[in-house]
């Protein structure tokens, strides 16, 4: 007599709790990417020209601000370079780890706590014009976030049967985006431009320290929620049969024959997809890195506008994902992706024609933000 089939059902509560790992990741990266490029611009401008970026802008020497952007780009690219090296290392180490708290949790906890401690030192060293201290703090955060990242990503598949992982991935992404949204809210209520655009005498360290401290506290809280509610070893033992059933069902639905070599057509398609992904992410990361400086130094607008752009972009992405699925069903994925990339290209081209409004609205002489850029951001 055969045993009755195991019914697979997603544990939504557990998946939401696992999502707190992504909450911490996106929270930290949003603060890091929104504040650090401007910190680097100001501190290198001061080191190279003896004046803050605000003084250079007021004095009509904005071209000197532009001249330090290559340094900013190199330093900000280090997280991607570190990811190429460190993510596979920590991923492999966590795969082989066995501990009373699981194989992923030791890396998640260590990465979280060390990053949370080092993170607030970035604005502190910046405020006191200490380039070495600031760069070292950034490096520590990068290294230990890489320790955190891969195990955090792997945790959900470890405790979720394969056929349910797509739905689970959607849930944890929502929790993660809440972390990114928390960072944008900090940027709206504590605009970086209020610090950057004022004189040295009026620059108060708390103006830039608070977002980093809050981010560190929320990261630790999210890690603690994860630790006290998700017991890796216990869950894996409890759902062992479900995981095995999930593997069996996945093998039936999408059989893969590893013994057959990849065809030339499939190989060419793979390389084309990888090339497209590479170019897309290179473009998107470049814009993401410099958008804060673009708003503060070129448009001369308040930095909170950058955060509003982030929110608008996030909402537009969610709507776009929903629409794209339906379009792909009708015209195919290839044409859907091509149309999407074409629309993004048009958005970037239009963005190059945006110029400062010239209308002073801020206490430090900031201009009003071009409304058209909000529209372009939705398009791109």
Language model features by range: what are they?
Residues 34-70, 289-306:
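Short amphipathic helix-loop junctions that connect adjacent transmembrane helices
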Residues 75-83, 308-317:
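Transmembrane alpha-helical segments of major facilitator superfamily
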Residues 1-13, 125-136, 143, 147-148, ...:
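Intracellular loop-helix junctions on the cytosolic face of multi-pass helical membrane proteins
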Residues 107-129, 342-367:
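C-terminal ends and interior cores of transmembrane alpha-helices
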Residues 84-101, 320-333:
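Helix-to-loop junctions at the C-terminal end of transmembrane segments
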Residues 118-148, 278, 362-380:
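Hydrophobic core of transmembrane alpha-helices in multi-pass small-molecule transporters
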Residues 96-112, 330-342:
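Cytoplasmic membrane-interface "Motif A"-like loop-to-helix N-cap segments
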Residues 8-49, 266-287, 378:
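Pair of pore-lining "gating" transmembrane helices in MFS-fold secondary transporters
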